[in-house]
Amino acid sequence: MSEAKNGPEYASFFAVMGASAAMVFSALGAAYGTAKSGTGIAAMSVMRPEMIMKSIIPVVMAGIIAIYGLVVAVLIANSLNDGISLYRSFLQLGAGLSVGLSGLAAGFAIGIVGDAGVRGTAQQPRLFVGMILILIFAEVLGLYGLIVALILSTK
């Protein structure tokens, strides 16, 4: 009888998995984006060391992806309690997977665009604006996942 009111004992497992998925997948995307963009910056800085600070933008944008996952993971962790329902814990799992997997995809996109964009900007500075626009569109992919995750986790 208490199971219907509070949910089964294993219900919190799914919410914890949602928090873990949010952090792990978004951090993987951010790490890939940082590493891929960072190698492009390192290669470019040999030829054009004066452009290092201008080229750091993809690395910063990749790091923001991890912050999205952190926000959702903290929201999920703060909403955990002993009597969480199975419905609520599945919502938390969905929220974590939403922000995590969209962060992974956004991190991959930011890394690839950042690497090619930084190398191209070193040779042709007019490519900088185009690189920034493409990076913004890649970052928005992670933002969409964050919005869906916030809607799910606060439901």
Curated annotation (Swiss-Prot):
Post-translational note: Ubiquitinated by RNF182, leading to its degradation via the ubiquitin-proteasome pathway.
Transmembrane annotation, as ranges: 11-33, 56-76, 93-114, 132-152
Pfam families reported for this sequence: ATP-synt_C (PF00137)
GO molecular function terms listed in the Swiss-Prot or TrEMBL record: proton-transporting ATPase activity, rotational mechanism
Positions of the record's site feature: Essential for proton translocation: 139
Alphabetic keyword roster: Cytoplasmic vesicle, Hydrogen ion transport, Ion transport, Membrane, Synapse, Transmembrane, Transmembrane helix, Transport, Ubl conjugation
GO biological process: pH reduction; proton transmembrane transport
Bilayer topology: Multi-pass membrane protein
Compartments, as annotated in UniProt: Cytoplasmic vesicle, Clathrin-coated vesicle membrane; Cytoplasmic vesicle, Secretory vesicle, Synaptic vesicle membrane
Residues on Cytoplasmic side: 34-55, 115-131
Tissues where the protein occurs: Expressed in brain (at protein level).
Function: Proton-conducting pore forming subunit of the V0 complex of vacuolar(H+)-ATPase (V-ATPase), a multisubunit enzyme composed of a peripheral complex (V1) that hydrolyzes ATP and a membrane integral complex (V0) that translocates protons. V-ATPase is responsible for acidifying and maintaining the pH of intracellular compartments and in some cell types, is targeted to the plasma membrane, where it is responsible for acidifying the extracellular environment.
PANTHER family registered for this protein in UniProt: V-TYPE PROTON ATPASE PROTEOLIPID SUBUNIT (PTHR10263)
Subunit details: V-ATPase is a heteromultimeric enzyme made up of two complexes: the ATP-hydrolytic V1 complex and the proton translocation V0 complex. The V1 complex consists of three catalytic AB heterodimers that form a heterohexamer, three peripheral stalks each consisting of EG heterodimers, one central rotor including subunits D and F, and the regulatory subunits C and H. The proton translocation complex V0 consists of the proton transport subunit a, a ring of proteolipid subunits c9c'', rotary subunit d, subunits e and f, and the accessory subunits ATP6AP1/Ac45 and ATP6AP2/PRR.
Protein name per Swiss-Prot or TrEMBL: V-type proton ATPase 16 kDa proteolipid subunit c
